[in-house]
Design a protein with these regions (language model features):
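Hydrophobic faces of well-ordered beta-strands that scaffold small-molecule active sites
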Residues: 1, 39-41, 75-77, 106-110, ...
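Catalytic domains of carbohydrate-active enzymes, especially glycoside hydrolases
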Residues: 22-43, 199-210, 325-331
């Protein structure tokens, strides 16, 4: 599941959604009960007025805290690793601790930061955002050192100033104990750029991908196979295997007509700017992200832009068909979100999950 800790309001259509820890924990506990394997939330650093709603919880802390109130689900904390700067010892110690708290159910989503305003919030001068590919080089060096701290049996010394990658931290006789319980925690990143794919192929176990064709399920099914093959091949060249996950919003009711009416009601409640329906009220900050370009390509069939990277709309049978189609083209898993999260998640569990089990997509 893909949680909403940022209080993003896609539409004025009524919803129970809340940014609060209690609401999101209830969603994760329901997902845990249904047998979902993974819970995750994005993280953003925006100035006043940058969010649709009133608040944004820290995803690193919130997902880690959920470990004490869940049983089986894996919890993925998001962290911008280049803001601060972050020292490898901090991340290694925090990660090992959360690994023990969760009994091996914790992992980290590595984010390098694509918005200029976020880099400036942490002290970069205007125009001082770290160059796109350089960010991945710096993050890779950080993860190399963190992995060493998790694995080494002796003290570690390292000087990043000598590598020329742009990091400025040093370690002299560094040591982290206890080590993670079951080896290295799961590492995740979201990307669509060549540099991001190269990073994922070296470090990640899971990569969150986006549809090159935009949000409509037909365009996604048409354009994703080549994208998936590129990512898998990059990992295979390094004798690694990585899983690809995509983020659909599931809009479902008992009948196709009811589901379409629900999706239309969400769309009609979207705010407008200059007569054009927009996604929530978020401002358009300067970003060099490359993963969402498909939404701007008019040659592809576009969706309603009501949440998620792609949209799965329909009756339970239709939703199961679309998830099965994603599986057939090579998607390893889906990180689902919902407009009215908890009620819609319960609908998924009671009406759609049994169909996926019948098709061998769930156990």
């Amino acid at each position: 599941v893909f949680l909403n800790l940022q209080d993003i309001h896609v539409s004025s259509h009524p919803t129970s959604n809340s940014w609060t820890f209690a609401y999101n924990l209830a969603c994760v506990q329901e997902a845990d009960r249904q047998g979902f394997e993974l819970a995750f939330s994005r993280m953003q650093w925006l100035p006043k007025g940058g969010y649709d709603g009133s608040a944004s919880l820290d995803a690193f802390i919130a997902l880690g805290a959920m470990a004490a109130a869940t049983n089986n689900i894996h919890l993925i904390s998001t962290l911008h690793v280049l803001y601060g700067p972050l020292h490898p010892l901090h991340l290694a110690k925090w990660g090992a601790t959360l690994d023990h708290v969760s009994q091996g159910r914790w992992g980290i989503n590595i984010v390098t930061g694509h918005r200029a305003v976020e880099h400036e919030m942490f002290g970069a001068p205007p125009g001082g955002r770290i160059e796109h590919d350089q960010r991945y080089a710096r993050a890779g060096e950080l993860i190399d050192v963190v992995n060493s701290l998790w694995a080494e049996d002796e003290n570690l010394s390292y000087d990043s100033n000598k590598t020329g990658k742009g990091n400025t931290w040093q370690l002299n006789g560094a040591w982290v104990t206890p080590k993670p319980l079951y080896g290295r925690p799961v590492i995740v990143n979201a990307t669509g750029s060549p540099a991001g794919i190269e990073f994922a192929s070296s470090y990640s176990d899971i990569v969150f991908i986006t549809s090159p064709g935009g949000a409509h399920i037909d365009s996604a099914l048409e354009t994703l196979p080549e994208h998936i093959a590129t990512i898998k091949a990059a990992a295979q060249r390094k004798n690694r295997n990585i899983k690809t996950l995509i983020n659909p919003i599931v809009v479902s009711r008992d009948t196709p007509a009811e589901a379409e009416a629900y999706a239309q009601a969400i769309w009609e409640g979207k705010p407008e700017q200059e007569g054009i329906k927009t996604f929530g009220g978020n401002k358009h900050y300067d970003s060099d992200a490359q993963a969402w370009k498909g939404r701007l390509d008019e040659k592809h069939k576009q969706g309603l832009n009501i949440g998620g990277n792609i949209e799965i709309i329909g009756s339970p049978e239709q939703v199961a068909d679309q998830i099965e189609a994603l599986h057939r083209i090579g998607i390893d898993g889906v990180q689902l979100c919902f407009y009215d999260f908890l009620p819609d998640l319960e609908h998924f569990g009671s009406k759609i999950l049994p169909l996926l089990k019948e098709r061998g997509l769930r156990v």
